[in-house]
Amino acid sequence: MSLKALDYESLNENVKNCQYAVRGELYLRASELQKEGKKIIFTNVGNPHALGQKPLTFPRQVVSLCQAPFLLDDPNVGMIFPADAIARAKHYLSLTSGGLGAYSDSRGLPGVRKEVAEFIERRDGYPSDPELIFLTDGASKGVMQILNCVIRGQKDGILVPVPQYPLYSATISLLGGTLVPYYLEESENWGLDVNNLRQSVAQARSQGITVRAMVIINPGNPTGQCLSEANIREILRFCCDERLVLLGDEVYQQNIYQDERPFISSKKVLMDMGAPISKEVQLISFHTVSKGYWGECGQRGGYFEMTNIPPRTVEEIYKVASIALSPNVSAQIFMGLMVSPPKPGDISYDQFVRESKGILESLRRRARMMTDGFNSCKNVVCNFTEGAMYSFPQIKLPSKAIQAAKQAGKVPDVFYCLKLLEATGISTVPGSGFGQKEGVFHLRTTILPAEEEMPEIMDSFKKFNDEFMSQYADNFGYSRM
């Protein structure tokens, strides 16, 4: 019998080949256990509100008024909403062509893009053009749009850091391109060695692959490191020499938990370097409302800014964006509020600062608690989370555990994470889902569980790990191939 169009066997092979570990086997098993009544702690996704982070008050007030503009005509509105929230709601409604239910320009509302440009100028000290900023349904959609323009076929390669966020591997696979890995150095706090980049490019070219772009994730996901200014300079010189477009995933730029290495944007470093390099390197920078102290993942708000991209290429990207008509308009309002929050003297300023600082300070404490907790466990080592929302400990698995995983038909770190899930309800992501060096095993967990629950979670992990290591202990120690 002949196959129908959507029978599994006749599906697009790119769809079948792409994998997304963050919602893979572990997540599916966790969902099954939850249906059976087991308490599950979903630390597999950087989803702050799902783990109890409270929304910031001011942006929710503004968007509520935008969603229900009839409230603005109520004579009692000033008794419920502060005057600055009312004023901002009127401002954003005036930017639309018919409220939040009307399509915007396919690049996003011009007024919001102007606010994003002003934010970038304040952050970096260099001009930003609203015409080169596109608002998107989360940063992920922007990444997919740009990769779609870069990848022409299977012989086009994208340099991606390993460990990497599987958005990149999945999208590259879906678009029919080739992922070219470059490995971060765990012993150097997940630093980047440009020599490794050169080797990766040379190896790819020897296989007939044309490397066209490089991805950096700063701060890192899943690794949690912040790139130094010197490292970013090296990367930009490398991209200039190799004529690569640099994709700067900077969605965690608010999530910084130490003072020694602040976030520095790729654009600022590029502009600081001056001509000719500042005029040569093609750069796309991404940001979102989903991370930081906002954590508005479900709103799906993001943007990308283009630097040194030719006008005709910008027109083509605009054309492709137009196919989807309009990004989510309420999310565009959230983006405007993120880049232009209450200012000193505004009625809502003190509350906004209190809420945002409280979230960041708590995340900093949780990052330390989780790192210290992992490092107190047998056969577990973990670099401190400098930024982002994750810990990425290395699990030194005994050879007996590796053999047991093989017999069960599982990758060793998947085997470990499944056992952890079954025993404790903690849902993590195995390091193999992000890529890692051969014979080395990790897991990724968010640092997002409520601060008051963190000691119990880490105690539960330690108890499980001690029992696991005792059960599979052998005379050969752990794997460090």
Swiss-Prot record:
The keyword Nuclease does not apply. The N-terminus is blocked. A motif (Peroxisomal targeting signal) lies at residues 479-481. SUPFAM superfamilies: PLP-dependent transferases. GO terms for cellular component: chloroplast; chloroplast stroma; cytosol; mitochondrion; peroxisome. It comes from the Eukaryota. This is Glutamate--glyoxylate aminotransferase 2. The gene is GGAT2.
